[in-house]
Curated annotation (Swiss-Prot):
Residues 687-711, 750-820 are annotated as: Disordered. One of its GO terms (cellular component) is nucleus. The gene is ppp4r3b. It comes from Xenopus tropicalis. It comes from the Eukaryota. Coiled coil: none annotated. This is Serine/threonine-protein phosphatase 4 regulatory subunit 3. Residues 1-100 form the WH1 domain.
Length: 820
């Protein structure tokens, strides 16, 4: 019995004026030799460690609040509180404190909280040691009472004495009786005085007075007094709102009357603090600290009582997931959980952990999966709020659930896919819900909060799951708005600029911008998973179609996606960009923007400036060789001239290097087979092909088996010779200005190889042959050649090989026809 009676929680007040839970234990009062006095000791019930050792100081002001709380300050800005499980235990310790200080245990405050200057004045005015004499509680004295209450607020000593006087004489209930009389008599002046009186009593900041004012008997009359603000022409109707508009709904009947009363009281007190009372000035901000604590401890108590009632929570979950539950009832159940989770935010971390683990064990995530798919907007919004609490609490818990779920369910009903679909289908024109859901998804796929243990790595497991089961749902709107059949139609028309697939609908553009933001996050934080996906789906080409959108913010999102990819300085990505000629839509956007100096212009130039500064050789060569003539007229920045300089410097270096190599070695360079990829890249490709059944980089369809590929030196020479003959036959015709015109009509399959199985042919670009039969410089890393049987074969060329090949200065340089 004594254990239960002395069971307490220890709280300290932090810098944000919020109570931090320091642990649960058992309190005792004993003489401590080291401290030379009676002290309060709290030992943890878990391991017996000392949670608190505090000497009962004769001059410290202790307060007893709500029958089960003792609060005091040990030093400046260091407040402590003991929250007792039982009133009897609180009374016992309170008596010990009062005994040490020589006080009557019936008082709620043992000392006046006074500073030195106040104490000096206090000693000079012995008459203040008496309690304040209150005027008789009658109508004619209301003005005098109001003046008294407002006058003491500036003095801590007088506030304390007034609070004691009000408590001892039962004065508040008498005032509230006068309020009823004034309302019956329409005594407006008296009602205005009562507003000042009740507001002033609240600012006394005394828990004992709050207990009276917020009791069932008094609280509505207190609210009534606060309706008659003299500054308002007409009184507010707070009581009408609380009694008629704000309805208390018991989704499951609450049998505990104390719990029900506590819920009512907390709602009404919160309403007083948030709605009725004016925002306190900088001089009044500490006047209501006890009111904040009152609400805080009430919420802690409510959550604890509900959490301990397993029958109640089990019934709530059962009805929430029952198909027979009607929509109205389900809406109420979801709203209850939303409020329940909101209250849980008042708990300390360890208590919040226990709270959410209780919900998880009862099945909160499967329940959310059901309600998030409902048509009711209110239900979905409330479910999203609950989901956000869970993700914030433990992303790992949510990830573990969805991976287990994937073993038993289809992709379309997985929780994460339900969340993605809600994001995509958000009917809000501003996509407020979609933005919230996107943030939650980003938290779930963020490797920074994923765990790595000796037995398993959450990161690799979850990302494998996400890219296999969820990524296609996320990118569906993007791929639908940049669909392949429309791209092919655009290619027939001759220019990607005639594209009709760019969404002009503002809401769709916003959604695509959100999806791109998430994909950009993936590029930054995921490795081979997103690389694999981008190359298999030719995703960057699809994204860059959005550069044509009339919504500049969407074009910038598309550009940002490409910028992040280039920022990785990954040659895999660089080869993909070069082979797909993916700078063309970016340069078209720059040229279309004309002389306008805007964010799009600056962002595009910054991308090319990054390539120049970082000296990304493969991209520099590709840009200069294919686009420089279109860009050389841009002189307001030196970026493009700088790229040309970089290109020429590299070309000179390679020429010098080549001239220093004996001719016999140069000729031998042509007798080697295509080099293998780096081990890790080759391993990655092989793994991917096994898992996905698709090739990643080669820009051709696999129309033949591996047996048809050239084997050994002889076949390699045959295919090389066939390629050179084809080059001579396909030389472009010279234009009147001496240049060459190329129209790039890359299909999706030309960029990503075997991904597009329906394509009958693949567009490939082969450089014109020089006079000596060797291939001219071509920065594309993969070249399409025809074998004797007519099959298309992908060979890997490297820039350094091509740099070493001989070429004549008269060899024409290919240049695309850019859309105007």
């Amino acid at each position: 019995m004594s254990d239960t009676r002395r069971r307490v929680k220890v709280y300290t007040l932090n810098e944000d004026r919020q109570w931090d839970d320091r642990g649960t234990g058992h309190v005792s009062s004993t003489y401590v030799e080291r401290l030379k006095g009676m002290s309060l000791l709290v030992r943890a019930e878990s391991d017996g460690s000392l949670l608190l050792e505090s000497k009962i100081n004769p001059n410290t002001a202790y307060q007893k609040q709500q029958d089960t709380l003792i609060v005091w300050s040990e030093a400046e800005n260091y407040d402590l509180a003991l929250s007792f499980q039982e009133k009897a235990g609180c009374d016992e310790i309170w008596e010990k404190i009062c005994q040490v200080q020589g006080k009557d245990p019936s008082v709620e405050v043992t000392q006046d909280p006074i500073d030195e200057s106040e104490e000096e004045r206090f000693e000079e005015m012995p008459e203040t040691s008496n309690l304040i004499d209150l005027p008789t509680c009658e109508l004619s004295k209301l003005e005098e009472i109001a003046d008294l209450v407002t006058s003491v607020l500036s003095s801590p000593i007088r506030r304390e004495k007034l609070a004691l006087a009000l408590e001892n004489e039962g004065y508040i209930k008498k005032l509230l009786q006068l309020f009823q009389t004034c309302e019956n008599l329409d005594n407006t002046e008296g009602l205005h005085h009562l507003y000042e009186i009740i507001r002033g009593i609240l600012f006394l900041n005394k828990a004992a007075l709050f207990e009276v004012m917020f009791s069932d008997e008094c609280i509505m009359d207190v609210v009534g007094c606060l309706e008659y603000d003299p500054a308002l022409a007409q009184p507010k109707r707070h009581r009408e709102f609380l009694t008629k508009t704000a309805k208390f709904k018991e989704v499951i009947p609450i049998t505990d009357s104390e719990l029900r009363q506590k819920i009512h009281q907390t709602y009404r007190v919160q309403y007083i603090q948030d709605v009725i009372l004016p925002t306190p000035s900088v001089f009044e901000e500490n006047f209501l600290s006890t009111l904040t604590s009152f609400i805080f401890f009430n919420k802690v108590e409510i959550v604890s009582m509900l959490q301990e009632d397993e029958k109640f929570l089990s019934e709530v979950f059962a009805q929430l997931t029952d198909e027979a539950t009607d929509d109205d009832k389900r809406r109420e159940l979801v709203n209850f959980f939303k409020e329940f989770c909101a209250f849980s935010q008042t708990l300390q971390p360890q208590n919040r952990d226990a709270f959410f683990k209780t919900l998880a064990n009862l099945g909160i995530l499967p329940a959310l999966e059901i309600v998030m798919g409902m048509d009711d907007l209110q239900v979905r919004a409330a479910a999203t709020d609950i989901f956000s609490y869970l993700v914030e609490f433990s992303p790992s818990m949510v990830r573990e659930f969805v991976m287990q779920e994937a073993q038993q369910s289809d992709d379309d009903i997985l929780l994460i896919n339900v969340v993605i679909e809600q994001m995509i289908c958000d009917s809000d024109p501003e996509l407020g819900g979609a933005v919230q859901l996107m943030g939650l998804l980003r938290t779930l796929i963020d490797p920074e909060n994923m765990l790595a243990t000796a037995n398993k790595t959450e990161k690799s497991e979850f990302l494998n799951f996400f890219y296999n089961h969820c990524m296609h749902v996320l990118t569906a709107p993007l791929l639908a708005n940049t669909s392949e059949d429309k791209l092919e139609k655009d290619a027939v028309l001759g220019s990607i600029k005639t594209s009709t697939v760019c969404p002009d609908n503002y809401q769709t553009a916003q959604l695509l911008a959100l999806i791109l933001e998430l994909l950009t996050f993936c590029v930054e934080h995921h490795t081979y998973h997103i690389k694999n996906y981008i190359m298999n789906k030719d995703l960057l080409r699809r994204v860059l179609i959005l550069m044509n959108s009339k919504h500049t913010f969407l074009a910038l999102c598309a550009l940002r996606f490409m910028r992040r990819i280039i920022g990785l300085k990954d040659e895999f990505y660089n080869r993909y960009i070069i082979k797909g000629n993916l700078f063309e839509p970016v340069i078209n956007a720059l040229l279309d923007n004309g002389t306008r100096y805007n964010l799009l212009n600056s962002a595009i130039i910054e991308l090319f400036e990054f390539i120049r500064v970082e000296d990304i050789k493969s991209l520099t060569s590709h840009i200069v060789e294919n686009f420089y003539k279109a860009l050389e007229s841009i002189e307001y920045v030196q970026t493009f001239k700088g790229l040309k300089t970089r290109y020429e410097q590299e070309k000179d270096r390679q020429s010098q290097k080549l001239s220093s190599v004996p001719s016999i070695l140069r000729s031998n360079r042509f007798r080697r087979d295509a080099r293998a990829l780096e081990d890790d890249e080759e391993l990655w490709f092989n793994e991917d092909e096994e898992e996905e059944g698709e090739a990643v980089v080669p820009p051709v369809e696999k129309t033949k088996t591996e047996d048809d590929f050239p084997e050994g030196y002889e076949k390699f020479l045959e295919t090389k010779k066939a390629k050179e003959l084809e080059d001579k036959e396909n030389l472009p015709k010279r234009t009147s200005v001496g240049g060459f015109k190329f129209t790039f009509s890359h299909s999706v399959s030309a960029a990503n190889g075997a991904n597009s199985t329906n394509s009958k042919s693949v567009a490939a670009h082969t450089p014109p042959a020089s006079s000596n039969g060797s291939s001219s410089k071509n920065t594309s890393l993969t070249t399409t050649v025809a074998s004797a049987k007519g099959s298309l074969i992908g060979l890997v060329d490297y820039p350094d090989d091509e740099d070493e090949e001989e070429e004549e200065d008269t060899s024409p340089r290919k240049r695309p026809r850019l859309g105007s």
